[in-house]
Amino acid sequence: MAFQRPGVYVQETLNPVQPIAGTNSEFITAFVGEDDRGPINTPTLVTSWNQYVTLFGSWNSYTNNDVPLAVYMFFSNGGSQLYVTRVAASPGLSTRSLNDRAVSASATLQVAAKNPGRWGNDLNISISNSIETGYFDLVVYSGGTTDSNVVETFTQLSMTASDARYAPTNVNVVSNYVTLTDLNSSNTGTTRNPAVVVNQPLAGGSVGNAVSVTEYTAGLAAHDTVLQSLVLNLPGQTAVNVVNAAISYAEGRDDVFVVVDGIDNTPADQLVRSGQYTPSSLAAVYYPPLTITDPTLAPGATTGRTLTVGAGAAVAGLISTTDNSRGVYKAPAGLQARLAGVVSTRQLTNANLDSLNTAAAPVNAIRFIPGSGYVVMGARTLKAGYIDKYVPVRRSLIYLRKSLTDLTQFAIFEPNNEGLWRRLDATVSSFLTQFWSQGGLRGTTPSQAFFVKVDAENNPQYLIDQGQVN
């Protein structure tokens, strides 16, 4: 490992004895994929289905439903918070320019959809006079122009920049649907206010081009601003180059674990596909896809319709609940690892299960177990061989690395002497003792579970002279 800047560097040593590690995970889930609306390449924290609907809309009309279905399954399986990042390829932005009230009218205000996409073409706006003279009201409609389609109303707006009710400032801060731009009309006073209009549609929005690995790579890179460790899923995405881009991002950060959706095909086909993915301990595949009752049906519609979704989002929700109830040391698998909302899956034979589990790129099976329901019965990463082939081992190592890095930040630029070594020893030992006591490390005593060495033997003078402490 090269040491090129001041900081804390943690090196892993995978010993033959397998640790059980983990507790109170710092992980947060992240979904990256296509959506009708929402900010592009901007990880957006959502803590409920309703909040997702507010920020990204409900079921998609112009792109696939992989992301909204993933969000729905995540929260249905106990997930509490996640980042959603929309990816898109050059989508068009819906806009409408409004003229002012002068006799020689000129453009005064542009109303644009909050973000690009064809969804913005479903917006309409109306401008009316406010109760107070010299101000105007703005009404935003979505999906129609009746009172039931009103989604936002803004009253007593002004086009005077010095006014406390200046329209762009007041609307852009709070609106989930539109942004306003002052077009700097050459007219003055209240004549700069937009003229009264009724149900004017926005236009120009488009889905854009087909999304490729380029857009996914940009969406992944946007998570560099998220400092927490991530459980990452690309809802519905099984393309080799895209999944491998996610694995590459995880390996570059070393605190990201990728949950990969299995393909909607036979176990043999899944084994071929998994073998094409990068053999990394930072990723795991879950198969087969899940059949669920279609949640996109309108209230009162005929029930019983089902659809198929990737397993990754439900597994991400399960990982979140397992982390909170047990810790990262516990594999998100077993008879208690029930996936909610599942009505059926492809049935796997014992021979299928054997091949999935023993393959060079193992696949974690989801099975129906009488008395337990549809449960995850696998905890293997895509890396075969060493002990980090197990999901809880790799995620525990991520947790330990990040925790120890955070806990020892105080050591940067401290005098590298016995006093610092004692502080580091005490800090790390205290953390690992607590970690062990909660079930994260094997051993009946702390000394059997771990050791901490910070002394003159592993800190010789030549390393001290280089500014390192080990």
Regions flagged by a language model, labelled:
Residues 170, 183-186, 428:
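Gly/charged, well-structured mid-domain segments that form the phosphate/adenylate-handling core
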Residues 106-169, 175:
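Extended, Lys/Arg-rich, non-catalytic nucleic-acid recognition/anchoring regions
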Residues 45, 54, 180-193, 197:
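Short, surface-exposed polybasic-aromatic patches that bind anionic ligands, especially phosphate groups
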Residues 1-103, 110-116, 130-133, 141-144, ...:
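Structured, hydrophobic secondary-structure cores that serve as assembly/anchoring elements
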Residues 100, 159, 182-185, 204:
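Generic detector of low-complexity/intrinsically disordered segments
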